[in-house]
Structure formats: structure tokens, C-alpha cells
Amino acid sequence: MNDTNDVMHVHSESISPKKNDLDIELGESVVEPHLSNNSIAKLDTYELEENEDISDYAYKLAGISNEHPAHPQNWGWWKKAYIVLLSTSLQMYVFWTPNFYPGVQDSVMELWHLSSQVSLLGQSMFVLGVALGPLFLGPLSDLLGRKLVYIGSLIIYVCFCISCALARNYAQLVISMLIMGVVGSTALGNVAGAVADVLGDEDSNWGMYMFIFMCSVASVGSPMGTGVAENPKLTWRWLYWIDVIVGGFFIILFVFTPETLPAIVIQRYEQKRQGLPVSWFPQFSLKKLAKDTYFVFFMAIKIFFSEPIVSSLGIYNGFVNGLLYFFLQAIWPVYFSIYKMSDMAASCTYMAAMPACVILLWFEPLQCWLYKRDKRKHQNRLRPEARFIMTLFYVWGFPIGIFMFAFCSKVHIHYIVSLIGLTIFNIADYHIWQAMLLYVTDAYPNVSASAVAAFELPSNLGAVGFIHLSALMFSRMNVHWATAVVGFASLPLIALIYALYFYGDRIRARSKLASQRVPINTAAH
């Protein structure tokens, strides 16, 4: 998720990068962007010394000021709202595909005579692709811009949706799902970057909320998969034809959507202002793309093994993210087998994520107020630990919701009780994900692209593991104790949030990459 390095726009003291490195190579005519003290992405001296030959990527956004009149953060509110809504809606579209896969699973098991574990490969390979895609699609979006990556990845995504719809064997379906996951990962990295392009520091919470909310709306894929797959006039293949139709609609919208990458927007503005030819198709080389991709990957691996904050949060988020797919499997033995609901009614219970995010919306202003108050208390200095103020309370909803679902899913207890437990779990789950992502970008502003990549890789790999582990657990344990086991496993993880809130500043003080104190330019607010 390379592009999420812009999720939190951090004002920091400028360094003095080389002029040649600051040139934005987007066309034949290179115009130096408007510079100021407020760098969007500043590379740490430590990093430059050790990676002098691969630092092009880190310099990409250096010196671009949000005070420039052409900067996307200075656009009209309606234009920014449209871009945020469209970009985050893409996340809903891409992620309803792994959510509708349970509707496909039974059909492909019967069609190609597969075991239950093998039949899950389509879903798990999609999630694996989402984990791997940002490692090279992220740097590509910083070279070509958000718009071209959106359109290009969507075209490939739609092509392989057609491949899934016409699959002649299971291998074709699995390989196509893997490629769909890789190119569909733009719904994580590119979307987060585009949202950060148009929203400043003070508004980032709301942008991340929309990012998380559209993830919850993707849960509509569960009943959609059941309804379409069970319709004899449609069958499971029509789920992928629906993806093709909706994907074509998104392609058309993005063709008429403006570019948001500040480097390109400012470049074109300066070219127009000076009467120079405007470069609408950025130039780049495969060598430069390879260098930038290598930089993100190299630093991501280095950060994961050398920074305990990132590695611990990444593993925690792998558990958190994996439980979403765990409960996608758990709803069937509970609501179909215990409560005797129809397939459609049982699949609709997975949409408990949507009211959970609506509830989060009501408390988002409180989190923003607490965050601003914390900055005032610390002399207007951004403190990453302030992202966890509300999390200290939300984190307890994680085991509470899991245990409610585990031990209240019984015939003599109304199903609404277990649904409330599932909703409480989702409230905690989505809030923790949002808080951890913002914490990582705040704590590692100089290498945030690689830090987020290091954070997200184990997160999605955890989801891959839980897809297969959950099926194994439910085949060998009853649903009550299978769910209780993950509930007990979540208890020690509560300590991690408290440890980072109270001792995170001391841990960051020992890091060469983490930021201890990030000054805020109050004049900009």
C-alpha cells in the first residue's frame, strides 16, 4: 500500500534535497514545483546514507507544498467530496468479490469435485494478490499518477472477471482470482493515496472513515453471492459478469475524473501558466519503476524486522483482518444450522459490519476533538499515540463481541443477541484498523510508504491463513468453542494497544526511522 504514505499530510522541517532529484519527470518540459518549508514526504538522513542508489522514490514528493494554488487540497469541497466518494466506492466494488465467494464455493465444489479446503483457494488467492499488489502498483502510481493506474488496473481486473465467468476448470478460476487480487489492490493503496491527495491533516480522520466504511459496505457481497448463485437462471458465473458490468461503469467514471497526484497536477499547472506544452501522458522507464519498487520492498522488509512497532501492529492487524473472514465462515453453522435461517437470511447477517461503521460515525467527532486537544496539550506537536485515545475503550469490544457471539449462539437465545455481539466485534475491528493505519503513518512520516507496506503485508497474509484455518476449525470443533478460541487469543493483544499508548514515545525514541516529534504548522490551519 505504497500510496497511503499521504494518508496523514505531515508538516515537517525541510531538508535540502538535490535540485535534480526534485525535478518531476513527467514530460519533456520539466518545471520545478512550488517549494516551501512544508514537505509532504521527507527522507531520513539515515535512509539516504544507506540507500543512495535507490532514493528516487523517496524524493518523489519532496518539496511539494499544499500552499501551491494548484494543489488538490485547495480544490472546491464538492470536487474533493466527489473524488473521495468515487475512490472509496471502488474499494467496495473490489472487496465484495472475496465476500461473495462463499456463494461460488459450493457450486465449484460440485462442478469440479473439490474438497472444502481446495475450493477456498479462489478466495485466499484473491486476498494474497491484494497483499502483493501494492509492492509494485504503489510506486507505479507515483510515476504515472493515480488516474492511469486506476484505469489500467480496472481494465485488467475486468478482463480477468471475464476469465472467471468463462472458467473451464478450477485452475483457470484460481489464477484469474489471484491476478484480480493483485490489480484490485489499487482499491487499498491507490484509493488511500488519492484520498490523502485531496484532504489535509485535520480532515484525514474523515477520509479514513470513508475508507473503512466502504470496506464494511463490501459485506453486501455475501447475500449477493448467495442470491445470484442459487438462482437457476443466473448461476455463480453471473457474479463475475456483474463485476464486469460494474467495472466498466467505474472505468468510464475514472476517465472523466481529474488526476489528484500533487506532483502531476502542479506540473501541468506550471506548464500551462508558462505557455509550455502540457504532458498528459507521463514518461517513465522500466528501470526507474524497478528501482522504486525495489526501494519500497527493501525498506518494507527492513522495517518489518527492525521496527517492533510496525511488526507487532502488522501481526495484530493480521489477526484482526483474518477474523473478518473467520466470521464469514462462522455465520453458516450459526444462522443456517442453529437458527434454521434460509441461505439468504444467513448470508445477510454478515452485513452487521455496516451498522457497526454507522455507529463509529457518531463517535468520529469525539475522536477528532480528543486528537486536537492532545496536540494543544503537547505544544501543537503531532503525537501518534493520540490516535489510540478512543482505542483504549474500543479494544475491549473485540473479545466482548467474540464471546457474545460464541456463547449466545444457541437455540434458546434469540439470534439478535449473537448479532449484537457480531456488531460490537465489527465496531472494535474497524476502529482498530483505522487507528493502527493512522498511527503507522504518523510515526514513520519519512518512510511511510514502506512502513505501511510492512504493516499491510502480514495483515493480508493473516487473512489468507484464517480463510483456510476457519474451515478446518469448524470441521473439527463446534462453533461455540471454535469462536471462543479466537476470543481467548485476542485477550493478550489488548495489552499491545495500552503499551503503545503509554510507552510508544519511548519505543520510537530508540528507532532511527520513527519520528519522535513532528511539528505542526498552525498557520496552515
Curated annotation (Swiss-Prot):
Keyword DNA-binding: no
GO CC terms of this entry: cytoplasm; plasma membrane
Domain of life where this protein originates: Eukaryota
Gene3D superfamilies with a match to the protein in the record: MFS general substrate transporter like domains
Keyword Transport: yes
Bilayer-crossing regions: 81-101, 120-140, 147-167, 173-193, 208-228, 238-258, 295-315, 318-338, 350-370, 388-408, 413-433, 454-474, 484-504
Topology term for the membrane: Multi-pass membrane protein
Compartments it resides in: Membrane
One Gene Ontology term of the molecular function aspect: pyridoxine transmembrane transporter activity
Entry-linked InterPro entries: MFS (IPR011701), MFS_dom (IPR020846), MFS_trans_sf (IPR036259), Sugar_transporter_CS (IPR005829)
BP term (GO), one: pyridoxal transmembrane transport
Pfam families membership: MFS_1
Keywords: Membrane, Phosphoprotein, Transmembrane, Transmembrane helix, Transport
Modified residues (Phosphoserine): S55
Database matches in SUPFAM superfamilies: MFS general substrate transporter
Family from the record: Belongs to the major facilitator superfamily. CAR1 family.
PANTHER family given in the database record: MAJOR FACILITATOR SUPERFAMILY (PTHR23502), PTHR23502:SF183
Annotated protein name in UniProt: Uncharacterized transporter C576.17c
